Amino acid sequence: SRVSMECNRESIEKIKELYSHYLKNPSISTDSRSIKKGDIFFALKGDNFDGNNFVFQAIEQGASLVVCDNKQIEKGDKILLCENSLTMLQNLATYHRKQLKTTIIGISGTNGKTTTKELIQVVLSKKFKTLATKGNLNNHIGVPLTLLSIPCDTEIAIVEMGANHVGEIGFLCDIAMPDLAILTNIGTAHIEGFGSRENIIKTKKELFDFVKNNSCEKSHIFVNFDDEALKDETFSKKTTYSLNTKADISAKACCENGYAQIIYKDNLIASNLVGVYNAYNILAALTIGLHFGVELEQIKKAIEQYTPSNNRSQILKTNNNTLILDCYNANPSSCTSSIESFANMEANHKMVFMGAMKELGEVS
């Protein structure tokens, strides 16, 4: 595994030492401005900042330990010097993951992953103690932070994984070690970093590949049977779902005044999500809920009570207008879906405000 590959003996000892400290103070910070008493502060480097410059400020603010990688910093009781703070964060997260009995569901895809993640959590929390990625902390820093926020008594965690270059999902899987996986769909986001649609497909499928290659009793994949790039995925433990054709879990999409709904076995499941494209996100959450034995009535209740609050399919009413906020992120496929859905809504005067889309490379 990645941890043993990247660690010499000294590093493994440091991780164990760090882990015993983490168990007493299981709160991690990478931002010196928002440190709480007892936090472990990881001094990370970014394009415009270097956390090593804030080591002593972090201690003054109450950090119980600082992990840093600038050799100029003098050793102290609260300072753990290592080769690379980011690698140490990732390795600590993997070490914690290995101690957990928590079932981990990995989620990725071009569109809908954050909404689907939120829906899966509200559904599963009807029966289990759950945790899900906060916001979209889904990269090489966010995934370790998510793992390190999982208490030992968590039964199921839903970990979101994003990527903008080949190999990134595989790397995140090595850290999070998901037992189950779902890919919402495959579109054309971040194509600049991937180089081609084929590379996007290959990278997203690294999530399925990890689960298949590390098969255990819990292993399972959930396949969007309506997605051309995903429908032929083979694995002995898989569940397919579809809005258009016969699958393990089949439903029909409908829209009531702009809000996504699905009909499953004569049961109408409504939502507070604008846009018929959200029907897939609802169906994915239903499929996973059924897999884990959540009763249909509870699944329906969870989805119908969920209200988005993160500029994704969110509705705000003012005195004069109804605003639909779907502006957290954008790519050509998600934008097309949003506009088609908006076109089908009944309203006298409609207006669209669009921003730019970046990282599209050749297809700009």
Per-segment meaning from a language model:
Residues S1-N91, Y95, V274, A343-A347:
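N-terminal leader/targeting and accessory segments in enzymes
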Residues I40-F42, V67, G106, I158-E160, ...:
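Structural motif
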Residues V55, E60, H165, I169-I175, ...:
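Short amphipathic alpha-helices and their capping/turn segments at secondary-structure boundaries
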